[in-house]
C-alpha cells in the first residue's frame, strides 16, 4: 500500500514538473519573435512597464527605434523571401548589441514587421555610436550585395537636466525622430536596397 501511495505521489510530482516546464516554454515562446529570435512587442511592452515602475532608480535609459528602409518595396519587387532575408539580417546585426559585445544591460526587440527597438539601461555610448555599431554589424551580414538600409530614432528617459519624461513621451520622441530621419533620407544614399 505504501509503495502504491509513493508511486502515485511520484507520478503527480512528475506531471507537475512536466506541466511547469511546458508552461515555461510556452511563456518564453509568447515573448519571442519566431522569425528573428529576438524578443517581440509583448516583451517590449513588459520591459517598458518595468522601466516605468523603476524609473526613479535608473540613471538613464536610451530607447532606439530602428526601421528597415523600403521593406514593402523589397517585398513587392523581389518577393517576401527577400523581405524576410532583410528582416533576419537586421536582427542578426542588432543581436550582438544584446549579447554583451558592446555594452551591458541591453535588450533588443522586433516590435513590428520592419521595426526594431533597443533599450539600453545606463548607456555609456551615444546614439550615434550605437547606430554606427549596428550599421557595421549589418555590413558584415551583407555578403551577397543585397544591402539593407536602416533608419534610426532615439530618446532618453531623462532630460539633460535629469528630470524624467513620461514613458509615452519617451516612446513618442524616439518615434518622431525616426519619422524625421525617414523624411530626411527619402532615398538612402548609403545603401542600394536589394539591387
What are these model-derived regions, one by one?
Residues 1-34, 42-52, 102-104:
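Signal-transducing coiled-coil linker helices
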Residues 31, 40-62, 69-96, 109-113, ...:
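Conserved long alpha-helical elements within nucleotide-processing catalytic cores of c-di-GMP signaling
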Residues 76, 80, 131, 135, ...:
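Catalytic-core segments of nucleotide cyclases and related cyclic-nucleotide turnover enzymes
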Residues 89-159:
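GGDEF/GGEEF active-site signature
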Residues 57-59, 102, 160-164:
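Short, solvent-exposed loop/turn segments that connect beta-strands within catalytic domains
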Amino acid at each position: 500500500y505504501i509503495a502504491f501511495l509513493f508511486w502515485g505521489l511520484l507520478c503527480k510530482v512528475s506531471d507537475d514538473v512536466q506541466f511547469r516546464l511546458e508552461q515555461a516554454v510556452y511563456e518564453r515562446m509568447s515573448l519571442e519573435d519566431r522569425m528573428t529570435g529576438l524578443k517581440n512587442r509583448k516583451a517590449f511592452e513588459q520591459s517598458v512597464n518595468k522601466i516605468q515602475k523603476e524609473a526613479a532608480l535608473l540613471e538613464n535609459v536610451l530607447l532606439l527605434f530602428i526601421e528597415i528602409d523600403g521593406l514593402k518595396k523589397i517585398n513587392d519587387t523581389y518577393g517576401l523571401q527577400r523581405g524576410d532575408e532583410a528582416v533576419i539580417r537586421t536582427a542578426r546585426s542588432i543581436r550582438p548589441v544584446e549579447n554583451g559585445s558592446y555594452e551591458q544591460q541591453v535588450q533588443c526587440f522586433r516590435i513590428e514587421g520592419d521595426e526594431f527597438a533597443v533599450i539600453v539601461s545606463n548607456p555609456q555610448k551615444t546614439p550615434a555610436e550605437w547606430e554606427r555599431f549596428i550599421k557595421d554589424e549589418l555590413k558584415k551580414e551583407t555578403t551577397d550585395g543585397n544591402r539593407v538600409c536602416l533608419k534610426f530614432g532615439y530618446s532618453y528617459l531623462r532630460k539633460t537636466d535629469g528630470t524624467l519624461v513620461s514613458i509615452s513621451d519617451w516612446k513618442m520622441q524616439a518615434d518622431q525622430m525616426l519619422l524625421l530621419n525617414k523624411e530626411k533620407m527619402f532615398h538612402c544614399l548609403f545603401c542600394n536596397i536589394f539591387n
